[in-house]
């Protein structure tokens, strides 16, 4: 079968899809919105999709009997390949049944998804594009209850090398990850920003009343999203910086809109002075972002996976930029996030884990109206790169182009 000759829906394999509210599910929903037919294949056995016209939803989760075998740590390689074989059969069945023209395999919380999609695509004779929401090789270094750390560290690089050798193309969210991957694969790589609906934010910005910028009033910093190891120490340090500011007579309150509970966050060192709110739906998150005085964009400084932090592009980045609010980036200096903010002048960057330093950054935003104006203008200018319409069109174009980029197909050892 020659790639590019088929006419049929695209299939997307992911551990999370709408109506989930996390960044990956929201981004996929935006990229594929209005472009049916589409086949969505979820590896989450608890996924309960909502019916969407033109969209076919199926679960390809691993059954209990196979999952139970993961306890046999002495034969993890065999068990992993068993997981890949089973999931690949489910994906292949869907590809053939629905006459799919290609499949997009997303990195994420389930390490089996990517190799299983590669195997299924080979068997079905369709191209497979990898969507790197994060660096797949780095994800093998994150502790995972399904597999032992020792086995993951030994096998992650070789498994990634094989899937990259068989991919028809790779989608990445930023330049730094593209540069890293260019050294590991000859497949075409394109940058697709995590998209945002710019006209929605324009409407929200226009509906807000004029702000009173008195340094002596109470100011708000907002963060919308998950908080785990990848953000935790940066969020904690920001909260401590606000205590420093109170000693200087500046009242700033941190508001976290997150799925993590207040008790859980406090147990991890987030002070009780922080206002913790339940996670909100995308439209409500947009309002929160536009109404905040300052937006916090954190990435952790001390983690077990620094390479993942270095190349990370948070799904909310485009939303923050489109809000036009001053953005406080608290992230390591070598991270894509810090580099991007500095290069395009849209964020105040604090790249040291020091409460006095972040207090100084916040104080500058509060006291300097010209700085706030420059940050807002820079954010709005940078947000155009995240246009939902532009990135959706580029995504569709890349999927069509990679359908003509044929790899020399050979028997895969991933499921052998």
Language-model-detected regions and their locations in the chain:
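A short, well-ordered alpha-helix in the C-terminal region of glycosyltransferases
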Residues: 371-385
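Nucleotide-activated donor-binding/catalytic signature segment of Leloir-type glycosyltransferases, i.e.
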Residues: 258-293
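Membrane-proximal helix-turn-helix segments that form the acceptor-binding/catalytic region
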Residues: 89, 93, 119-123, 136, ...
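Conserved donor-binding/catalytic core segment of Leloir-type glycosyltransferases
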Residues: 212-232, 239-240
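N-terminal subdomain of nucleotide-sugar transferases
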Residues: 1-60, 242-247, 416
């Amino acid at each position: 079968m020659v790639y590019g000759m088929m006419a049929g829906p695209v299939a997307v394999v992911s551990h999370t899809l709408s109506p989930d509210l996390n960044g990956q599910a929201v981004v996929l929903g935006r990229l594929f919105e209005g472009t049916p037919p589409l086949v969505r294949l979820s590896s989450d056995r608890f996924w309960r999709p909502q019916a969407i016209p033109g969209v076919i939803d199926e679960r390809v989760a691993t059954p209990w009997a196979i999952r139970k075998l993961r306890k046999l740590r002495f034969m993890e390689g065999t068990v992993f390949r068993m997981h890949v074989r089973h999931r690949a059969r489910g994906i292949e069945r869907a590809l053939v049944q629905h006459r799919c023209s290609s499949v997009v395999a997303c990195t994420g919380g389930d390490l089996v998804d990517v190799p299983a999609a590669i195997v299924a695509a080979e068997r079905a004779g369709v191209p497979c594009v990898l969507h790197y929401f994060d660096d797949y090789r780095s994800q093998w270094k994150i502790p995972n209850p399904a597999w032992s750390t020792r086995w993951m560290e030994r096998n992650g690089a070789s498994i990634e090398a094989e899937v990259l050798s068989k991919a028809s193309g790779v989608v990445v969210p930023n330049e730094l990850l593209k540069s890293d991957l260019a050294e590991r694969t000859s497949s075409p790589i394109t940058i697709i920003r995590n998209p945002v609906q710019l006209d929605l934010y324009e409407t929200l910005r226009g509906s807000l009343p004029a702000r009173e910028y008195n340094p002596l009033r109470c100011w708000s910093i907002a963060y919308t999203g998950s908080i785990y190891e990848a953000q935790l120490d940066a969020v904690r340090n920001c909260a401590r910086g606000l205590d420093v500011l109170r000693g200087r007579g500046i009242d700033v309150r941190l508001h976290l809109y997150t799925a993590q509970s207040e008790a859980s966050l406090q147990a991890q060192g987030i002070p009780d002075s922080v206002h913790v709110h339940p996670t909100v739906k995308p439209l409500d998150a947009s309002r929160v972002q536009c109404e905040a005085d300052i937006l916090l964009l954190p990435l952790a400084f001390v983690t077990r996976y620094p390479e993942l932090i270095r190349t990370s592009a948070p799904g909310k980045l485009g939303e923050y930029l489109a809000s036009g609010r001053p953005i406080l980036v608290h992230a390591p200096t070598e991270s894509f996030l810090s580099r991007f903010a500095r290069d395009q002048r849209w964020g105040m960057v604090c790249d040291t884990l020091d409460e006095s330093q972040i207090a100084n950054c916040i104080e500058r935003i509060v006291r300097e109206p010209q700085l706030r104006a420059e940050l807002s203008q820079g954010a709005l200018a940078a947000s155009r790169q995240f246009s939902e319409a532009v990135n959706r069109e580029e995504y569709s174009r890349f999927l069509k182009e990679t359908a003509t980029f044929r790899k020399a197909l050979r028997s895969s050892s991933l499921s052998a």
